């Protein structure tokens, strides 16, 4: 079976590494998605274990589609009756990039019509009831080549099940996990987020430290598939739980807003990591730690979303002064979409990496503690 894992731009290498660790074969990455080969048992394994992928798609076919007739015939050739029961719903969604068939609604209609014709012929009926559960069909048209998939995940994998409410502009859990992994945190050193918001980054750090699979507390679309035995899901969950660590961890989140801290504590409890994460009301401008080593990973408020630009820059300036008090053994990673972040922070990044939080373009700025101040030229 061929799988495709869509992901936020910039996370492809992390997703590819996750797939290799899960022993998937023929892993290959391209912009915004990673492909691999596996068996039916890998559907639950991927959904339960992936931290940075957006969802798990089973590729059913790939074929040239320069026109509607080619698209129709390619979709109609797929043995839909082997996977979609007679009365199940099969909605269609997709996208088109650099293709002659650029109208997504028109392509959706063609894919739906072709799949319905094939199913109608197989089940001997002109009209399909679509009263049962859902098989979500997806397609991607890229440079006149169509790929057709079934979505095994349902809700995106960033929905871990622990964040019932958000405050302000949320950071996707998949991106939060990616930031933690990019910081090279593995659970041994102190970990801090002085702008914790709803607690997503510290919670994802705790899940990584404990090696707890992020999908254990939610359900997936493919759990209802008749073609996928329930035992595969039970085996995948048991395998994941057997690999959990149980230790003591120094993970801390702070926020100046008491309601954010309370929400973070609630979310940590839902995630099952409240025993290893502390949340406190704290001012990021006064952040300080004496330990020789540690990771600081944070996503301060973006000027264009939560604060006026001038307020945001003042916040970055005071936070930058605090970060410079950290010992040289600390690694600092800050995610921001602010184009003048480095100037306001008072230091040029040692390394930068382009990332996206949904459709919002950001940069991950990498530093070490103890660096000298650079003059603010603004």
Model-predicted regions and their roles:
Residues 1-133, 377-378:
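Non-catalytic nucleic-acid substrate-recognition regions in nucleic-acid-modifying enzymes
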Residues 45-52, 155-160, 164-165, 371-378:
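Flexible, glycine-/basic-rich loop-and-beta segments that form/coincide
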Residues 97-100, 156, 301-305:
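A short, flexible beta-alpha/helix-coil linker loop
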